[in-house]
């Protein structure tokens, strides 16, 4: 097991499911609160950590949105993103496609360009300093209405050349993908890639809607695809990637026992599964922690993790030439280990 953990630690990989607001560690939360004179509902860092005891997605979202209140300036968003990039770099993440939730900021009076300029400054720094490649995916909050999503897409117009795609996150059950069919169609017309959280707490019908109605390019989470055999076969044949987040699933009680996690089964069925950290500050683990958890609890072997790492590059929105270059780095690492 020790050799496998060492192998995983340095394995070249991409991360395709990371909410940048969900990488806000309690220490940085307090630092930004002090900087911006924001009063937090917690007396200290340990109290924040103690509050990270969720029973479901909604309980997590309630505290998640509280945390965003400390983010006010371009510097704040840059510091937030850089903290993640430094941490991901330690896990040998070569490429990251990060979600951001502009509505959670614009709704509290933070201009869209403040969010974007801060994130773009961090991306420029990460590319220059760490050699990482980074793409942005702008998520619509599904508990809000489609008109709010349209307004957000309009705000993004000046930055569309800096945004790879749009996504759909927040409270899944009761907010099906079909609620956002028109804004996703417009985003597609603008040349953006499309992803959506589906099949995390919602059943397999949410995944089917995301594929059939939104015409998404990638499935975020997708655990409950196991409920629909035809959908699994379709996903395997189309080689659409699933961005699965094991520790998130455990923390939110989606899969309470990692020994029962569906990822190994989906991998054996030929689906293009990837491993990701989702909201690592809240769920207690970055991407390598998620890899290691599946090694420990699911018995995955080195060859499985190589396939998953390959999937992470193949499932990205990078140009084919860049994907090939990253796969070459991966192959050389495997050959040299």
From Swiss-Prot:
Cofactor list: Zn(2+)
Record-listed substrate binding positions: 279
Cofactor-binding details, from the entry: Binds 1 zinc ion per subunit.
The keyword Metal-binding belongs to this UniProt entry's keyword annotation: yes
Top-level enzyme category: hydrolase
GO cellular component terms listed in the entry, alphabetical order: cytosol
Family: Belongs to the metallo-dependent hydrolases superfamily. Adenosine and AMP deaminases family. Adenine deaminase type 2 subfamily.
Cited function: Catalyzes the hydrolytic deamination of adenine to hypoxanthine. Plays an important role in the purine salvage pathway and in nitrogen catabolism.
UniProt name for this protein: Adenine deaminase
